[in-house]
């Protein structure tokens, strides 16, 4: 029996250095630069992920550059569809005075306060959840008819997509964490395509 398949991968290693210490304001400036940065040069896509991407029927990417470059590097072609709805959920750094820590630490603290409801004017957790539900519907529609869909996205929002897809009945058949080039592979029994007018 044929299955619809969605493979959701995190982008590769970005070019912007994380080897800095920043206060909360500087982290927000760093994040803005990160959002427009591309991939670090001369990196290899894991063999399994590259094989899946090359065999996919449709390649989809977030609208951010690092995701688009990752999609092309993995699949060998430009994305068929690019969605702003797949961008990473925001990271509003909490006001912690002059304390300076690494971007990774800021990311952790920012994600915690965001998760529990503090967004400081950025997209809220509730709104991002709705976005994830909407995007999971779009991805599911693309996969109908036994297609293999490769999606190049971002760490936390990929997790949110996992929850949305599971609510729809998708099964996560394999996954390997949340690091760069990590992935989650989802499958469901093939949904038939419905032609207009029938």
Question: Residues of each region from the PLM?
Answer:
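Active-site-proximal alpha-helix that buttresses catalytic centers in soluble enzyme cores
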Residues: 2-86, 104-135, 187-189
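Generic beta-sheet signal
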Residues: 6, 57, 147-155
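Short active-site-adjacent structural elements
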Residues: 16-17, 158-161
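Domain-level recognition of soluble alpha/beta enzyme cores
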Residues: 26, 169-194
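Glycine-rich phosphate-binding loop signature in dinucleotide/nucleotide-binding domains
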Residues: 52-54, 139-147
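A short acidic (Asp/Glu
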Residues: 69-73, 160-165
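Signature for phosphate-centric chemistry
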Residues: 86-101
């Amino acid at each position: 029996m044929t299955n619809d398949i969605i493979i959701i991968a995190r982008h590769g290693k970005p070019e912007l250095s994380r080897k800095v210490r920043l206060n909360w304001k500087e982290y927000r400036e760093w994040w803005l630069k990160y959002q427009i940065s591309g991939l670090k040069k001369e990196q290899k896509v894991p063999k399994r992920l590259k094989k899946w991407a090359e065999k996919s029927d449709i390649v989809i990417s977030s609208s951010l550059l690092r995701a688009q470059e990752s999609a092309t590097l993995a699949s060998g072609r430009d994305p068929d569809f690019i969605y702003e709805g797949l961008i990473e959920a925001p990271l509003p750094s909490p006001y912690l005075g002059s304390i300076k820590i690494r971007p990774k630490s800021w990311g952790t603290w920012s994600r915690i306060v965001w998760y529990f409801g503090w967004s400081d004017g950025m997209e809220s957790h509730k709104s991002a959840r709705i976005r994830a539900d909407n995007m999971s519907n779009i991805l599911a529609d693309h996969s109908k008819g036994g297609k293999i869909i490769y999606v190049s996205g971002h760490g936390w929002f990929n997790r949110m997509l996992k929850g949305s897809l599971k609510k729809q009945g998708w099964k996560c058949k394999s996954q390997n964490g949340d690091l760069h080039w990590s992935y989650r592979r989802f499958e469901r029994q093939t949904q038939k395509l419905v032609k207009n007018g029938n």
